[in-house]
Amino acid sequence: AVGPDIRLMIDAFHWYSRTDALALGRGLEKLGFDWIEEPMDEQSMSSYKWLADNLDIPVVGPESAAGKHWHRAEWLKAGACDILRTGVNDVGGITPALKTMHLAEAFGVECEVHGNTAMNLHVVAATKNCRWYERGLLHPFLEYDDGHDYLKSLSDPMDSDGYVHVPDRPGLGEDIDFNFIENNRVR
């Protein structure tokens, strides 16, 4: 259990039907969750509009729907989400992710970035309408404080207060282990 000072969100990862997503969302509202993310298949934008219209808790999406950043404009126009989702790997790069952030800002909507990485950290730092940085994945088989083998250190270490800072190294700030890359090239 956690206290009231801990913010809770849920990523339901497409598991629910419309009626089950509604029941889940209403339960989460009673528990004080901040949002419900992608509870249904994202191919049905009308289902998301229906859900957003019927819940008080913000509905977040789309995360993995096709259409890169252009499709997210349709979601905003339709009112299919209360908080827009983007990410460098989801929409085709840093520039499309920033375009998505600015699109949401033009609609007066928060836009949250999906996943960590140095690229996503820079997108979050460059915008005003993103409140959270999704660092790590709480999973029984993954350790989010372990970096990639090709890096000498984490791209996004968390400080003792729970904050992540943009690194001051050149470029995206990644500390690349070029010896590892050289020793693991396919020849």
What are these model-derived regions, one by one?
Residues R18, E42-M45, I94, H114, ...:
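Electropositive phosphate-/nucleotide-binding environments in soluble metabolic enzymes
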Residues A1-K49, N54:
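Metal-dependent enolase-superfamily TIM-barrel catalytic cores that perform enediolate-based chemistry
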Residues R26, G32, Q43-Y163:
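Shared catalytic-loop signature of beta/alpha-barrel
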